[in-house]
């Protein structure tokens, strides 16, 4: 999956997709990390089309918390790590750790996280959103949201080339 390229003035946000391409997303943001979480929760299409949020601030069992976890229509999980500070490399390292944890999740685990997150019934809500049953693909894609994602573009491209789906969302 690739994203279209568009000219972008310096004050815009960019989405760096699987292909390493960038597209204009929006205006300059001066938000706290929790506000970025809220923005992403309200606009999941920034991360992926047909995305259902499974949870936020999920305890992963290794003393860390995963910022956001989404499930695509095709059954792939997306691990989102958000950093307000200019340290995308740190966010990428955390996302890789979370990816390993996410790979071990069963459908029952996802149901539990979803119920804790929004009180909904995952199987019903997924069907209502996508008119389909959940079939986990086993794929887990990494997403880093940080102001300096371009600094780690080579690392993201290397992960993607090795078969680990990865992309970033950059903002000012």
Where are these regions (language model features)?
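Charged, terminal alpha-helix-loop-beta segments
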Residues: 1-172
């Amino acid at each position: 999956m690739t994203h279209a390229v568009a000219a972008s003035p310096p004050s815009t946000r960019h989405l760096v997709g699987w292909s390493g391409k960038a597209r204009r997303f929006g205006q300059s943001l001066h938000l706290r990390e929790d506000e970025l979480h809220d923005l992403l929760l309200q606009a999941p299409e920034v991360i992926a089309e047909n995305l259902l949020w499974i949870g936020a601030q999920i305890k992963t069992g290794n003393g860390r918390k995963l910022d956001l976890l989404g499930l695509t229509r095709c059954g792939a999980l997306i691990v989102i790590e958000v950093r307000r500070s200019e340290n995308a490399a740190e966010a990428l390292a955390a996302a890789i750790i979370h990816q390993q944890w996410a790979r071990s999740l069963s459908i029952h685990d996802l149901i539990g996280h979803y119920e804790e997150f929004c009180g909904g019934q995952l199987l019903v809500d997924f069907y209502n959103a996508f008119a389909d049953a959940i079939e986990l693909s086993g794929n887990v894609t990494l997403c880093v949201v940080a102001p300096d994602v371009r600094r780690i573009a080579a690392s993201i491209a290397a992960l993607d080339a090795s078969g680990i789906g990865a992309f970033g969302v950059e903002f000012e």
